[in-house]
């Protein structure tokens, strides 16, 4: 490596008066621009500019009234989970298991950093000890989930969605169940509710190690009380992050932090519910890239990106 070239690639950024941060330029081309002006595209599809990709986080649920064809009901409930919250409808979802690698970056953390992360306003929910004794700080994934909504938009207010019919690799899992209309004991595969988790753990050496996705999904069969289900999920976070620590142990990877979030729904009697967790790997729509170029996304906050796009915030309408 040419040390002078390496020094030139690194840079110092000002975050305010007497407050500078060192930013290390990536050794790998992480540019990720799709061939479409208004659409994101799946990673690895023809016509993209750059070697990189962008990971976007999403957890959502969908329900449908049961008909006499449970297979079709499952399709519709899954489709509704795709279109709710951050819009990822009309895609051919391909499954990956499940890392954001050295060519990838995370929307809302690395690119267009959510303001609560950029301003160091978020606090850990709890900590776990990793295999080497290093503490793993676990944060709510809400900022990253909000960032996904701001990028893709919603079903009623679409922005830079994935191209209709695009083939999109995603880290994903889902759970589907029927809640019977009658008040009777549940049968196998039936439930009062469904839920899904997503956890993203950032390696402490992202030049040489991958970030880890853990997805989890399941059925709630105890009762139809949403508060009880929510309490279960809040407790279940520690089981999900336990798996993070164990996967880190397996590959001797230490993580700097974990973001974790969940979605859930208690179905009405006679409904089928689906809980989806997914993280699409995409290249960004050309128009989603500021005029200063793709690297500028590493330097701006989500609110600055919204200003650059002349968008109002979808998750906080009082702000741009």
Swiss-Prot record:
Q: Which GO terms describe its molecular function?
A: histidine decarboxylase activity
Keywords from the UniProt entry:
Decarboxylase, Lyase, Pyruvate, Zymogen
Parts of the chain that traverse the membrane: none
E.C. number, please?
4.1.1.22
Q: Which residues carry this modification: Pyruvic acid (Ser)?
A: 98
The yes or no answer to whether the keyword Lyase is present is: yes
Catalytic residues, per the record, are 215
Cofactors (names): pyruvate
Which GO BP terms sit in this record? L-histidine metabolic process
Q: Cross-referenced Pfam families, in alphabetical order?
A: HDC
Residues flagged as site, Cleavage (non-hydrolytic) = 97-98
Q: How is the cofactor bound?
A: Binds 1 pyruvoyl group covalently per subunit.
List, alphabetically, the InterPro entries matched. Answer: His_de-COase_proenz, Pyr-dep_his-deCO2ase_N, Pyr-dep_his/arg-deCO2ase, Pyr-dep_his/arg-deCO2ase_sand
Query: What's the catalysed reaction?
Result: L-histidine + H(+) = histamine + CO2
Q: Does the keyword Transmembrane apply?
A: no
Propeptide positions: 2-11
Per UniProt, subunit arrangement is: The proenzyme is a hexamer of identical pi chains; each pi chain monomer is cleaved to form a small (or beta) chain and a large (or alpha) chain by non-hydrolytic self-catalysis.
What name appears for this protein in its UniProt entry?
Histidine decarboxylase proenzyme
**What organism is the protein native to?**
Clostridium perfringens (strain ATCC 13124 / DSM 756 / JCM 1290 / NCIMB 6125 / NCTC 8237 / Type A)
């Amino acid at each position: 490596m040419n040390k002078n070239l390496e020094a030139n690639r690194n840079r110092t950024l000002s975050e305010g008066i007497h407050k500078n941060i060192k930013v290390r330029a990536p050794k790998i081309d992480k540019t990720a621009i799709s061939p479409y002006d208004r659409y994101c595209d799946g990673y690895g599809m023809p016509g993209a500019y750059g070697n990189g990709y962008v990971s976007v986080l999403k957890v959502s649920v969908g329900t449908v009234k049961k008909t006499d064809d449970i297979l079709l009901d499952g399709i519709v409930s899954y489709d509704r989970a795709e279109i709710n919250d951050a819009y990822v409808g009309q895609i051919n979802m391909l499954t990956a298991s499940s890392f954001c690698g050295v060519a990838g970056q995370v929307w809302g953390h690395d690119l267009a950093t959510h303001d609560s992360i950029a301003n160091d306003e978020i606090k850990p929910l709890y900590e776990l000890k990793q295999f080497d004794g290093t503490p793993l700080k676990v944060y709510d994934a809400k900022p990253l989930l909000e960032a996904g909504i701001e990028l893709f938009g919603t079903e009623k207010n679409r922005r830079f969605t994935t191209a209709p019919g695009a083939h999109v690799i995603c880290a994903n899992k889902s759970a589907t169940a029927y809640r019977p209309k009658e008040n009777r004991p549940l049968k196998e595969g039936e439930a009062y509710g469904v839920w899904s988790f997503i956890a993203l753990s950032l390696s402490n050496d992202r030049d040489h190690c991958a970030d880890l996705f853990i997805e989890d999904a399941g059925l709630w069969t105890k009762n139809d009380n949403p508060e009880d289900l929510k309490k279960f999920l809040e407790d279940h976070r520690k089981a999900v992050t336990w798996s993070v620590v164990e996967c880190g142990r397996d590959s001797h990877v230490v993580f700097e932090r974990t973001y974790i979030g969940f979605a859930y729904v208690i179905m009405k009697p006679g409904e089928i519910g689906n809980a989806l967790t997914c993280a699409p790997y995409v290249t960004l729509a050309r128009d989603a890239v500021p005029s200063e170029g793709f690297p500028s996304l590493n330097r701006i906050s989500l609110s600055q990106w919204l200003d650059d796009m002349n968008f109002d915030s979808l998750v906080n309408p009082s702000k741009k």
